[in-house]
């Protein structure tokens, strides 16, 4: 590899790449500085005027469920240096960075991991043929001849390949189709989370960055959705540079690569990965510099906005009226002829899979709570409630149980519309809807937790507890139905705008864009940082199509075809005290109701200091969300689970459950039991805390560089394969069985 890079990436070419990258970054960062003032003004105006959106009925977690392991297990990884397949112990922590260890024993001994992979921008491929086709298309002229050895050979029929257009690729395989499906769901969850790298609560920096990306690409005549808007700001910036730099390098270096087609493909992957990380480091330094600069002047900008808010609004409205008078006739004709006829078909294509997915979320939540209720009746009441509720609290982050919800969106098709509206891929809409599903599931679970915790304060008996769970479930489902409708309608409106606005801007650009500079004189110089002609122009274009979009969504709600509430149905203060309950400390179900005999407080004989110490110890525990219920790989030793016990609970209450908790739609086909000990292996206790050296500052290292550091604490700022600095976490067990120390080689 070193010879390839030294040959094709010598000092002169590296200097050229750095200069080209710097030029692109300088141009983009000017857009970012311009958009920062606009985003700051919009944020402060939003705080004063409000959103106008319906009030959510469900609660949301203010303290996230950190310190958990989403998944752990074994899989084979292809080693590029030795060209061999090795068995690796892998786990996914709460930040969704895939961590690969030599084996489980290495993990328990806190040996540094082999790799930490941030999967933003990656795609999962489930066949070698798919991969070879993509590789052949990425570097023309390198398609291998029939019968020749491909770039990759998989020893089983169940591969999983992580493919990225610029960074290195990762090759895994499993022994069974069931394992492949399981890991595909887990890795897809990692990609979904890592792609959503810009924080949702970023009200200024986030919108400023995404608007700057859009404005920069439009300045290059690139409209429509962009698949590589994935990851955090630095990763997205790196993708932006590579979008322009990659084809240039490919044209220069492609003809110079030597060897068979497979070898040239391998060389190009190595070169592209090296360039990508050069760009990443340069983009990171430049972006942090500019971000620090705009944040330093933010207080002064806020002072101007607070003082002159009314004048800024008046000036912007005056500018908008002038632009509207100029473009409205052209925009209305364009909307009427090219957009309006297609809105119903686009909306229908979006509504069907999205509504099916949200219905599945409701069904999964219903079944999990119902199963928990039956388990409470049959197996110990409040004594087991803490264990069951801890599992339920993590339901939204269980990739396998949520998979039936997510996969509904995979049927989304915009056939015939993608080319017309320049929609390169539907993946951006699929992932956005899936993120909404996870959020609504977590909101429903958290609201259920909060209401049930209030009921438990009354000291109910087992029968009363069952009825309380039923009543709380019914309340939460009503709130979920309302919030689900609101979230879906907002998603439909945003998706329709995301499809139609770039199309309209592209259509209007030849006749309108060149005339925009003359409107600049209408903006007072003092307000020029908060009002931009381009942004105001886009808002006017948006308004011309917005009324048609709102009308289409309103008509869909009136039809009640997809269980959408009408806009006139508003639930005001249906639970006025509910939001007050959410202001308290997070509920620790394991602490309050684990073997407490129904009591929610520590034993009187337990010293307070010991209780606090126990809480601190528990806070460090890494709890696996996913408990492996299937047979392990052939090289694993899995203990057999006892056969499920036959429920013998209270007949009357079971009848109540059957009558009162029947969902409107059929439950999922697969078993989704929560808290049934017969179906899940018991979770082992955490190993005692081991002494470890003081943690060093977290280092963001480049992919592919092995560094002997401590156990991983993956960062969302990473890109590709990385290894993190030592952490003070103890070695903790997860629930997936594996054979520690086994090295299997094909």
UniProtKB/Swiss-Prot annotation:
* Taxonomic lineage: Eukaryota, Metazoa, Chordata, Craniata, Vertebrata
- Positions of modified residues (Phosphoserine): 568, 574, 601, 603, 609, 624, 638, 641, 646, 665, 681, 692, 696
Residues with the modification Phosphothreonine, per the entry, are: 606
Keywords assigned: Cell junction, Cytoplasm, Lipoprotein, Membrane, Myristate, Phosphoprotein
Location of this chain's protein in the cell? Cytoplasm, Cytosol; Cell junction, Adherens junction; Membrane
Set out the biological process GO terms recorded for this chain's protein: gonadotropin secretion; negative regulation of apoptotic process; negative regulation of cell population proliferation; negative regulation of DNA biosynthetic process; negative regulation of DNA-templated transcription; positive regulation of DNA-templated transcription; positive regulation of transcription regulatory region DNA binding
**How the protein is affected by changing residue 692 to A?**
Loss of melanoma cell invasion
**UniProt superkingdom:** Eukaryota
Query: Which gene holds the coding sequence for this protein?
Result: NIBAN2
Q: Where is this region: Disordered?
A: 590-746
Which regions are flagged for Polar residues bias?
720-746
> What's the reported outcome of changing residue 665 to A?
Loss of melanoma cell invasion
Q: According to the UniProt record, what happens if one changes residue 641 to D/E?
A: Promotes melanoma cell invasion
Lipid anchor positions (N-myristoyl glycine): 2
Q: What is the effect of changing residue 646 to D/E?
A: Promotes melanoma cell invasion
Q: How does it sit in the membrane?
A: Lipid-anchor
Q: Which residues cross the membrane?
A: none
| Family membership noted in the UniProt record | Belongs to the Niban family.
SUPFAM superfamilies for the chain: PH domain-like
CDD domains for this protein: Niban-like
What is the annotated role of this protein in its UniProt record? May play a role in apoptosis suppression. May promote melanoma cell invasion in vitro.
| Entry protein name | Protein Niban 2
Record's compositionally biased regions (Low complexity): 671-693
Where it mainly occurs, coarsely classed, is cytoplasm
């Amino acid at each position: 590899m070193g010879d390839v890079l030294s040959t094709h990436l010598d000092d002169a070419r590296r200097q050229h790449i750095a200069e080209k990258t710097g030029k692109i970054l300088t141009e983009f960062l000017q857009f970012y500085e311009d958009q920062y003032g606009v985003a700051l003004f919009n944020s402060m105006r939003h705080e004063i005027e409000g959103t106008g959106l319906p009030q959510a009925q469900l609660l949301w977690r203010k303290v996230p469920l950190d310190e958990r392991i989403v998944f752990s297990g074994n899989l084979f990884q292809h080693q590029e240096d030795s060209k061999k397949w090795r068995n690796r112990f892998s786990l996914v922590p709460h930040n969704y960075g895939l961590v690969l260890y030599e084996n489980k024993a290495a993990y328990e001994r806190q040996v540094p991991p082999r790799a930490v992979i941030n999967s933003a921008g990656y795609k999962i491929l489930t066949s070698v043929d798919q991969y070879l086709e993509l590789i052949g298309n990425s570097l023309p002229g390198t398609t291998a001849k029939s019968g020749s050895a491909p770039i990759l050979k998989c020893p089983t029929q169940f591969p999983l390949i992580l493919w990225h257009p610029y960074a290195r690729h990762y090759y895994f395989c499993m022994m069974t189709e069931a394992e492949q499906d399981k890991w595909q769901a887990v890795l897809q969850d990692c990609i979904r989370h890592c792609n959503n790298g810009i924080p949702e609560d970023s009200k200024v920096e986030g919108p400023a960055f995404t608007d700057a990306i859009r404005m920069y690409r439009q300045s290059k005549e690139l409209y429509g959705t962009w698949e590589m808007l994935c990851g955090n700001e630095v990763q997205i910036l790196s993708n932006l540079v590579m979008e322009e730099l990659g084809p240039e390098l490919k044209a220069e270096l492609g003809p110079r690569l030597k060897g068979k087609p497979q070898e040239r493909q391998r060389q190009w992957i190595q070169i592209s990965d090296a360039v990508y990380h050069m760009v990443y480091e340069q983009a990171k330094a430049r972006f942090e510099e500019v971000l620090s600069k705009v944040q330093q002047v933010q207080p002064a900008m806020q002072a101007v906005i607070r003082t002159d808010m009314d004048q800024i609004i008046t000036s912007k409205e005056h500018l908008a009226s002038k632009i509207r008078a100029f473009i409205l006739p052209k925009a209305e004709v364009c909307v009427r002829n090219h957009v309006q006829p297609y809105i119903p078909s686009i909306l229908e294509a979006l509504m069907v899979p999205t509504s099916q997915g949200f219905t599945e979320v409701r069904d999964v939540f219903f079944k999990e709570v119902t199963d928990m209720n039956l388990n409470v009746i049959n197996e110990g009441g409040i004594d087991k409630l803490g264990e069951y509720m801890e599992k339920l609290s993590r339901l939204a982050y269980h990739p396998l149980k949520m998979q039936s919800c997510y996969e509904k969106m995979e049927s989304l098709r915009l056939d015939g519309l993608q080319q017309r509206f320049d929609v390169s891929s539907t993946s951006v809409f699929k992932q956005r809807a899936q993120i909404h599903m996870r959020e609504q599931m977590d909101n429903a679970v958290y609201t259920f937790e909060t209401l049930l915790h209030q009921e438990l304060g009354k000291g109910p008996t087992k029968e009363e507890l069952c009825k309380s769970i039923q009543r709380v479930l019914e309340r939460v489902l009503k709130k979920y139905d309302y919030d689900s409708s609101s979230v879906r309608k907002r998603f439909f409106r945003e998706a329709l705008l995301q499809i139609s606005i770039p199309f309209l801007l592209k259509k209007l650009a030849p006749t309108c864009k060149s005339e925009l500079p003359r409107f600049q004189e209408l903006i007072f110089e003092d307000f020029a940082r908060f009002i931009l002609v381009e942004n105001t122009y886009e808002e006017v274009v948006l308004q011309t199509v917005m009324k048609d979009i709102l009308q289409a969504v309103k008509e869909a709600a009136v039809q009640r075809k997809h269980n959408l509430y009408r806009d006139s149905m508003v639930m005001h203060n249906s639970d006025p005290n509910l939001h007050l309950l959410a202001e308290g400390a997070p509920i620790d179900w394991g602490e309050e109701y684990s073997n407490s005999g129904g009591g929610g407080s520590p034993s009187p004989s337990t010293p307070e200091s010991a209780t606090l110490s126990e809480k601190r110890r528990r806070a460090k525990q890494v709890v696996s969300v996913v408990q492996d219920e299937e047979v392990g790989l052939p090289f694993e030793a899995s203990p057999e689970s006892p056969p499920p016990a036959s429920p013998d609970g209270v007949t009357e209450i079971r009848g109540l459950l059957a009558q009162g908790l029947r969902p409107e739609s059929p439950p999922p086909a697969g078993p989704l039991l929560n808290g049934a000990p017969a179906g899940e292996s018991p979770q082992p206790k955490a190993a005692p805390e081991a002494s470890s050296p003081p943690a060093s500052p977290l280092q963001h290292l480049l992919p592919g560089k092995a560094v002997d550091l401590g156990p991983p604490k993956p960062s969302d700022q990473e890109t590709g394969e990385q290894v993190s600095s030592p952490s003070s976490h103890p070695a903790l067990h997860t629930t997936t069985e594996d054979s520690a120390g086994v090295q299997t080689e094909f």
